[in-house]
Amino acid sequence: MRRRAFLRGVGAAAGTATAAALGGRASTRRVAAHPGPYEPYGSIDVAGAKEAVVGPDGDVAYLATTTGYATVDVSVPDRPELLADVRDPLADRDGGPLRVIFDAKLDVADPTTLVVAGPANPRRGAISGILVVDVSDPARPVEVAFHATDFPVHNCFVRDGLAYLTGNDGGRNPIVILDVETGAEVGRWSVADVADAWAAVPSGLRSVHDVYVADDTAFVALWDAGTWLLDVSDPAEPTLRGRVDVPDPEPLAELPESAVRRRATLPPGNHHYVATDESGTLLGVGRESWGRRVADDATETPAANVAANDSGASGPAAPLSAAPDAEFVGGPSGIDLWDVSDPAAPVPLSTVPAPATPDPTYGGVWTTAHNFELSGGVLYSSWYRGGVKRHDVSDPAAPTEASWWRDPDAASFWTARLAAPGEREGFFVASSMGVGDGPAGLYAFPDHAGEQADPSGVLPSGTATPRPRYGTGTAGGSDATTRPGADGGISAPGFGVAAGAGGVALAAWRLLRRAEE
């Protein structure tokens, strides 16, 4: 039974009052449902939208909104409605409010508990930690606790009353496990504890960007240090269970800082987001990367460019074109699928490539992989201005694209999350941080195959050449170059390990710290 009537009955007045008191930032647009061309069912503007998750009944979406958090009723997907829009939480505390909020997660085992994390990046003098919110009535969220940390919290995962936090401190960069009720630290793990060779790698190359927990296994995305699988059956003592696409640490340890900066945005590496399907045996690894113009490649990555990476701002609307004779190093990466049924011996299955882009540089048109969900044999994925996609991954060795929607002039998608499965009435939601001065918000899309009737012609057709994983590139010390082809896509052979020695997340934070000092 859909809950729209219930939500209206118990919380519509509160939701309206909250929205009005906090700026009335939401406005709804309607579109026609299927049959017909593939397009959104509906969307709603929510300022600052970043990560989104959906409750288990598929009726409510919960958003991190940069300056707060919000709940949206999506039970009628062509008419999403704002329930609550909370801005500047903890404003009454020293160092408050909690800011730069990019992540919010429901407890998988107790979806009445929402954890709001921040700041995503260091802010001098600002509070940092997790805000625990009771969302048993999503129209009337109640803040029940705040647990402070001595590190920024870029991302988190919550399961069984435990919050798994990205503990980037510029040193060991651990995963930190907290008790959601008490705030007590339960355990922690760092790749620097695995071997001295990893401790010698610059922290910017082994920043912990995200974490996902399935049953008693935590999957930790460590940027250029690959993805690590931990046994957390005893969360007080996480132990190593396996590793995915992990390079030799010694070449990374030998890179000078100038090389780290130069390669901060380039593949391979760049493990950004990880998630499994319901079985816990099919793992998706999203790799976030960009390219560099060959003409600029001899120069160091500008500090301002790197520091902007995790700002979360939509930024200016980069021109949707590049010089026709431009050559590039690197490019956007996709989502790798792995069989992890034996965690000690993961098997690569396939790569879902990124949409093609006319300009793969950091200042260009982003189409690299961002957050996603694997559910019911379908991969729901977001690609910034490259749009959202659905792939049939019932045979994960041969993914098939089933639908793709994009509007690169208006939407830059942060995540895609299943709300209700099924071709007839199913749908998924996707949050967009907007483009330029355009609004951010939440979209609802049909959960069926289809083709967009009139996609914007500014993006090339097809996909970018899949970026190599570690150990899959060609031998030799030179980087391959790419040139937009006839269809505007990026084509390039793979490169070796040295081409991907970046660590954009923590490199950005280090530069931000320097700028603030």
Name each model-derived stretch.
Residues 1-517:
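Hydrophobic alpha-helical segments
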